[in-house]
Every structure is written in structure tokens, then in C-alpha cells.
Amino acid sequence: ELKPLEELSKNLWWVWNSDGKNLFRELDHDLWRKVGENPVMLLQQISSKRLEEVLADERMMEKINATYAEFKEYMSKPMRNDIPSVAYFSMEYGLCNCLKIYSGGLGVLAGDYIKQASDSCVPMTAVGFLYRYGYFAQSLSMDGQQIANYEPQNFDQLPIEAVLGEDGQPMILEVPFPGRIIYCHVWRVNVCLLYTSDAADE
């Protein structure tokens, strides 16, 4: 009965849909803030007791089902076939705070482009990078010096999915560089259709 929550957590539709965001917030207000408004982490860390309470709450279950129905209706809209498909490339995408693949205004602009493409049913596939460390968090030392703290992103806790090849194994791209080959994993972010790659293996 709670499976719709998992599907909703893996699609960034909730980012710009107030019903979706409010649904996750209402599951556990304190935990939602603690996990940085990350629905994947929320579902991973929410207590079994709270889930039992949700299942027993008729109003909450109606809200889950209504939000999921709204999401499925949105996803059922066909892509336009009267315009060319679009390939969009950017170094960063500002989609949500929990997916640290942007650092400024241009990334937010790129994120808005693909959100609008999704709303407008434009057949767009976006390609970018999945940064392991994202942007840094700032802190101050005892003597007032700024310290840059780089915390690695745990890809298993993000609203992303590994792209699999025909053999069912994670897809890996080989990118030739001078004197070496970079091996990149391919990940999918469900918003319109955004593919990112990380080069953790070499």
C-alpha cells in the first residue's frame, strides 16, 4: 500500500508539485528537515512505527493515493511528436537541494529548462555529470578562517537510478583520454529524462 511513495521518491515531479512535497513532509516533519528534503533518505530512515501509523490513518492514505493518481496522470501525457526531439547538455543542473549537481544560477536555469520541457511534453533528453562531492559546505575555524568541507554524495540515497545494459548489468561508458581510459557509470534522473555520468572508476 505504500509502494507509491517509493515511485514518487524516484521522480523529481515532487520538486515543483506542492502536493508531492507536502506529502513527504507530512510523513515525518522532523526527519524531512534532517535529511535535507530528500525523499529517498526519508523512506530509508523513517521508523516502522510511523509507517504503521500512516497505514492506519485513513486521511493520510487518501492523500497518498490522490497524489499518486495526480502523478500518474501527469506521467501519462504523451510527448509531442510535432517538433524535433532535443538533446540538452549542461555541466550542472539545479533540480533540488538534495541532488548536488549544480552550484549557481546557470545550473538553476538549466534545471528550469528541463522542468518546463517536462511540463510542456517536449521530447528532451538532458545529459550532465553526477558529481561525487557536489559543492562544499562552509564552516569557520577557531581563528575565523573559512573551511571548505567536501562531503561525498551517497548515490544509493539519491533520487537517481543506475542505467542497466542489455545484460542487466550497470551500463559503463569508456571515454578515451590521452594515455588512459575513463570508465563512467550512467545514471538516470527522472524529471523529463536526464542522464548523468560519474567517473568514479578508472
What annotation goes with each model-predicted range?
Residues 118-136, 148-150:
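Hydrophobic or amphipathic alpha-helical targeting/insertion segments
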Residues 188-194:
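Beta-strand-turn-beta hairpins that frame and shape the catalytic cleft
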